[in-house]
């Protein structure tokens, strides 16, 4: 999949997969998590102490699912949670319940980020439209200050997926697992600098013309 897409296209293809084709959003989330997890294992990362920095949107849900896959494999993993769990998307709320079943620690201690050997960035996906501030900016600054390598899910948090612009502050990742298609903003100079090595993951979301051609 060499095509690069806009935010609007990413959202439209996602909605078509769930609302028209009927693929449950949880299935897509699990596929995104598994793709990210496999890239973590295949690349040269130190998995001694992994911290997944997740917010309560669906990008965060992807990360929380990654945390569970790591825990099942016997890897020391902690979730640094940003935002109120009561306001989580339905899928992310479910992922938090599953993480709780597996006794995955959830923290709000920034020192956990500082002491990690690998950080998974699952704060913001393609839908970010305003500058990052407050505790979200604090978390991104902590990620960038840490010695650990960082893997971003879909796009580095704080990067505009259309323009590649830094929205106040942005994660500088060593690797990014982006879903379905690359994003136009990650092809810009700044986008490339923040994304690191890009892995495009086929999770079952396609452009409508490809879907219709397959029917």
From Swiss-Prot:
The record lists the catalysed reaction(s) as: (6R)-NADHX = (6S)-NADHX; (6R)-NADPHX = (6S)-NADPHX
- So where does K(+) get bound? 59, 121, 157
For this UniProt record, the keywords arranged alphabetically read as follows:
Isomerase, Metal-binding, NAD, NADP, Nucleotide-binding, Potassium
Q: How is the cofactor bound?
A: Binds 1 potassium ion per subunit.
Q: GO molecular function terms here?
A: metal ion binding; NAD(P)HX epimerase activity; nucleotide binding
This protein's cofactor list reads: K(+)
Start and end of every YjeF N-terminal domain? Answer: 10-211
Enumerate the residues binding (6S)-NADPHX.
Answer: 58-62, 125-131, 154
Q: Which family does it belong to?
A: Belongs to the NnrE/AIBP family.
Reported function: Catalyzes the epimerization of the S- and R-forms of NAD(P)HX, a damaged form of NAD(P)H that is a result of enzymatic or heat-dependent hydration. This is a prerequisite for the S-specific NAD(P)H-hydrate dehydratase to allow the repair of both epimers of NAD(P)HX.
Q: Which PANTHER family match?
A: NAD(P)H-HYDRATE EPIMERASE
Q: What is this protein called?
A: NAD(P)H-hydrate epimerase
Species this protein is from: Levilactobacillus brevis (strain ATCC 367 / BCRC 12310 / CIP 105137 / JCM 1170 / LMG 11437 / NCIMB 947 / NCTC 947)
